[in-house]
Amino acid sequence: MSQVKKLSTGKIWCFAVGQFGWSVLAALISSWLVNYYQRDLATQQAGQPIFIPQGLAILGVLTILGAITAFGRIFDAITDPLIASLSDRCKSKDGRRIPFMRAAAVPFALSCILTFWSPVNGVSWVNAAFLFLMLMLFYLFMTMYCTPYNALIPELGSTQQTRKIGRAHV
């Protein structure tokens, strides 16, 4: 009978810390994107710059920012199962999950930072196109990191109790 290897507390905490970075990046996008690109009237009157066209610009229903973020979430929904499938079939010496996480970590952070940078100072469709590109890259790299990360949970330990403990620390 083989012995069940117990997952160390250190490994559990390392796994939990792995969520901190992507949680911060996702929180930045979800909390600040609208505030940064869709300024309210008081903020505009205070002199804060505007970078993308404002108002209901898409079929009189959506703002440019609303359309970009909606498309980003649809793109994310499409890439999630694709990345999951690629990760499941990965035959790397580093395992099935880690290569994706390594490849995505730095571009994920950079795409988040560049989402809040505008190539043109002032209102421009170039800024809207750049925002679209950066947000799609953000969601792609988030998927490349988070999907394999979450797939590590069953691989953390060999018992249900160990998996529960690992998930609870996250």
Stretches with model-predicted labels:
Residues 2-167:
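Membrane-embedded alpha-helical bundles of multi-pass transporters/translocases
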